[in-house]
A protein has these predicted regions:
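ER/Golgi luminal nucleotide-sugar-dependent glycosyltransferases, focusing on the catalytic module
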Residues: 1-184
Length: 184
């Protein structure tokens, strides 16, 4: 069974040894590949502020992610400018992004969904090689190996597995922190 891990979103500056330890835990004993898609600019969470923080123009996410993930089976990595993303948003999306009428969770979902869809496209040419696909974030730490779970049972299931176990939060919400399953 082959697994694709899609790391998507904004890279956060977390100690490299901690991230590597986390990825080792997550991937232990698995046949896997990693795909990464991020903004050029590393930063901080946009979703936990009343005001949108200014994005740093360090433009070194590619280098940092490459450095961290080089010890793992990193297949593809791509970054792009967050500022260019904002400039090139279609008009209806710009109106949502700049609106005071939408919940900030809706507003900040735009860049999250965008990077996730771009990361998914990185593995599309190889999609037939993967039995399971999991979405991961750069700022999440994984304390247990994924192989602890009955992954073979996931193969023929159309269930999307996620951290909203027992619908502990909102009943119909799938949190973007970690989710995945089979291609069904």
């Amino acid at each position: 069974m082959k697994i694709a891990f899609l790391f998507a979103g904004q890279y956060r500056d977390i100690p490299k040894d901690l991230i590597r330890y986390s990825i080792e835990n997550l991937t232990k004993g698995l046949d896997y590949s990693i795909f990464c898609y991020s903004w050029d600019e590393p930063g901080e969470s946009l979703d936990h502020r009343e005001e949108i923080p200014k994005i740093k123009n360090d433009n070194n996410s590619f280098e940092q992610i490459s450095n961290i993930f080089s010890a793992f089976n990193l297949k593809k990595i791509h970054t792009e400018s967050y500022n260019n993303f904002l400039i090139n948003l279609p008009k209806p999306h710009k109106e949502i992004f700049n609106s005071k009428f939408y919940h900030k969770g809706t507003i900040f979902a735009l860049p999250q969904i965008y990077t996730l869809s771009k990361c998914y496209k990185l593995q599309e040419n190889d999609a037939s090689h993967y039995d399971l696909i999991f979405r991961c974030r750069f700022d999440s730490l994984y304390l247990h190996p994924l192989k602890l779970y009955p992954l073979r049972n996931f193969l023929n299931s159309s269930t999307l597995y996620n951290i909203n176990f027992g619908r502990a939060y909102y009943p119909n919400r799938i949190y973007d922190i970690f989710f995945g399953g089979s291609k069904k």
